[in-house]
């Protein structure tokens, strides 16, 4: 690979001190790096000379990043920043502990079916969110799936993978690993749609179940197999795999894209249904445990005052007009950050937050007179978007509850209006943490036939602001007696009214625009479906519903919350 044959450990790259080479691939090298401006440890991907000098790639990467920026899906790994320094493109990402699925399969062999289904479902959630936003991944494979110790799965390399053409991948030698998961239409002149990602995810499911990709051999034979060979049956490869998985794999890997599942969620649901009843419970438990697990906090490292670094060039490229400074530079004042969720990362131990920043190229504009704000305390109340809802609470809260509601359900409104204030107080006091879930099963009872989904989408737009108190306020406001629509009413609420409600509780313009544009409708549909499945796992018959981690809470007892938090 050009430009990165030798490790650059111990050297400086702009404001980044490259500490350790942690990954190397066809598109670039990945380093554990110290960001000396923001005083944190990150994963830094340095793109190869070939890609960095390719104006088409540069343009596509910008475009794909903007598209991926609409994603607010917890299983998509985001980046902190990207740009160009000294003519080399880079991507700055959060560094956490984890292992890619390919390494896990090499070490452990095939996964138990419940675990395989749980991992594929999480990746399917990420892909469905991307597809709803008009983005495709194009390189779904075990190497691009990161699994934490708690089996929380992340899909990486969004933006980079889709910005790179198949021809470029071939030139860089990346196609060998990718071929095992490429849909037949990608080998022809046919236009590949998002269903190529569904095909690839099905191949990943097959490999998780059996320990090997569906087709093996040299490049030409694998390509030919994808196009012409019969779809293999996992039950004949590994004893103990339910025969029902044969049909799941056959549909997901159908040669004709139109014969495949419509969404990755459909694939995941079919895979879950193929499990034996006991294994379905195990898969649900794996998902629940992975979602409850606290996401790791990025590590930091003290930085000496007066650190020296070369300044970056603007994204437009060109020969840098300056050299390294002759004296220490002050910390630069930066322009306001443009908040986006750029879903792109690398095959290393990475995990992401929800709101991420694409900064304008920083410029030195004089010394700063104040120190940077301290990081929040480790026990601070935080917000995390989950596969089926939103977590609000502190890591030290002794009790975590699940609350399920439907936006036009009258008893749900009564429940929230009665207890929201006390719940908020308990969360602020770190006595309680809450996983909020919103469902949409009453859509057809609303005047617009989709109000519940629109309300769920609005809640995720607000969650994207990453403000726990704001989210809880908006969730409660949806059920206000002067706002909540009723079943079979002559009217419900418009997107403009939902946006105004968000504005009244303090949402920023980005969240308001998200609501008005309907950007999160696909995410809402997926997450509401996931929430319904989670609710079904508790054998609940409807909403409102409260679960304390071990049993159903009788919320009709006025003292239920006091009893719960002692």
UniProtKB/Swiss-Prot annotation:
Q: What is its EC number?
A: 2.7.11.1
Q: Residue limits of the Protein kinase domain?
A: 16-275
Post-translational modification, as annotated: Autophosphorylated on serine and threonine residues. Dephosphorylated by PstP.
Catalytic EC class:
transferase
Q: Which residues lie on this side of the membrane: Cytoplasmic?
A: 1-337
**What taxonomic lineage is listed for the species of origin?**
Bacteria, Bacillati, Actinomycetota, Actinomycetes, Mycobacteriales
Cellular component annotations (GO), alphabetically ordered: plasma membrane
* Principal cellular location given in the protein's record: membrane
Q: What is the protein name stated in its UniProt record?
A: Serine/threonine-protein kinase PknE
User: Has keyword Transport?
Assistant: no
Q: Which organism is this entry from?
A: Mycobacterium bovis (strain ATCC BAA-935 / AF2122/97)
Q: Which GO terms describe its molecular function?
A: ATP binding; protein serine kinase activity; protein serine/threonine kinase activity
Q: One Pfam family for this entry, by name?
A: Thioredoxin_4
In this chain, where does the modification Phosphothreonine occur?
A: 11, 50, 59, 170, 175, 178
Which residues are involved in binding ATP?
22-30, 45
**What stretches pass through the bilayer?**
338-358
Sorted UniProt keywords: ATP-binding, Cell membrane, Kinase, Membrane, Nucleotide-binding, Phosphoprotein, Serine/threonine-protein kinase, Transferase, Transmembrane, Transmembrane helix
